[in-house]
């Protein structure tokens, strides 16, 4: 049973080197295989220190909430330029060339193309971290499924797998719906790993606990369970046997476990 962990809550409070040490020691103690991190440029140096301590990190991309905040503060062009300036020099040259054929789509504010470029810039910044996996954000996955927009997801999968050579984790708040939709779209889901709430209480399991359990037991997809303790409402002794019985690949280390 693999243990994963989230860096997002931790890094909002990181201020001292001692805090970073305690984070890495906790992950090492529990043999965390993968630490998930929603890409934030200002946190990059802290994440680099965690990686240097031997913790494997997987970015969650694209960070739409951060992009929306930047757009609100200065418009989409300024938000994109700021991200472009932070790229490695080689990527600054290659990115415009790769997307030259998509200029018309960008001019028309094609949503899917914009998401792809945003994710590409974030992943390019994460390459120095030695990443081997990338998580496609639930904000994108669930929206694509809701709008029945296969092209958005296919484009992002190609970006992560072919352009960067990474394994894909699909984050979703609607496991039962998303898993069936991707199969309907003809996507080879056996190469993907799903990250979604799975717990004995059925908290966050959509469209229903039974539907999510069926996905886990199907053997057609790999699932890593999030929220197994329902934000601290369940003891790990009660939560762990339930997810193990479903045959999940692993689960996110609850914040309550020190």
Predicted regions and their residues:
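Short, flexible/disordered intra-domain loops and linkers
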Residues: 4-15, 68-74, 142-148, 203-206
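Substrate-binding cleft of extracellular glycoside hydrolase catalytic domains
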Residues: 57-119
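N-terminal binding-site loop/beta-alpha segment at the start of enzyme catalytic domains
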Residues: 1-54, 239-242
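Active-site mouth loops of central-metabolism enzymes
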Residues: 4-19, 98-118, 146, 229-234
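N-terminal active-site wall of soluble small-molecule enzyme domains
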Residues: 21, 41-47, 52, 60-70, ...
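Beta/alpha (TIM)-barrel catalytic core signal, keyed to glycine-rich beta->alpha loops juxtaposed to Asp/Glu
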Residues: 141-258
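Structural preference for beta-strand elements that scaffold enzyme active sites
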Residues: 2-4, 33-36, 44, 54-60, ...
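Alpha/beta enzyme core
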Residues: 17-30, 83-86, 103-136, 142, ...
């Amino acid at each position: 049973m693999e243990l994963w962990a989230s860096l997002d809550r931790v890094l909002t409070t990181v201020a001292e080197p001692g805090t970073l040490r305690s984070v890495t020691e906790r992950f090492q103690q529990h043999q965390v295989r993968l630490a998930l991190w929603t890409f934030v440029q200002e946190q990059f140096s802290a994440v680099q220190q965690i990686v240097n301590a031997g913790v494997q990190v997987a970015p969650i991309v694209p960070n739409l909430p951060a992009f929306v905040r930047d757009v609100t503060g200065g418009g989409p062009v300024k938000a994109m330029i700021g991200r472009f300036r932070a790229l490695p020099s080689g990527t600054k040259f290659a990115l415009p060339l790769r997307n030259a054929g998509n200029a018309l789509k960008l001019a028309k504010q094609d949503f899917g193309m914009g998401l792809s470029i945003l994710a590409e810039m974030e992943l390019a910044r994460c390459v120095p971290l030695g990443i081997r996996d990338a998580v496609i954000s639930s904000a994108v996955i669930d929206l694509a499924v809701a709008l029945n927009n296969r092209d958005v997801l296919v484009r992002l999968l190609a970006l992560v797998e072919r352009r960067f050579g990474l394994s894909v984790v699909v984050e979703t708040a609607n496991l039962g719906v998303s898993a069936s939709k991707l199969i309907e779209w003809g996507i080879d889901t056996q190469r993907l790993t799903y990250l979604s709430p799975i717990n004995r209480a059925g908290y966050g399991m959509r469209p229903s606990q039974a539907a999510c359990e069926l996905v886990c037991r199907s053997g057609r997809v790999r699932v890593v369970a999030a929220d197994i303790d329902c934000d601290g409402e369940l003891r790990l002794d009660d939560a762990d046997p339930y997810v193990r019985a479903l045959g999940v690949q692993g689960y996110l280390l609850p914040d309550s476990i020190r």
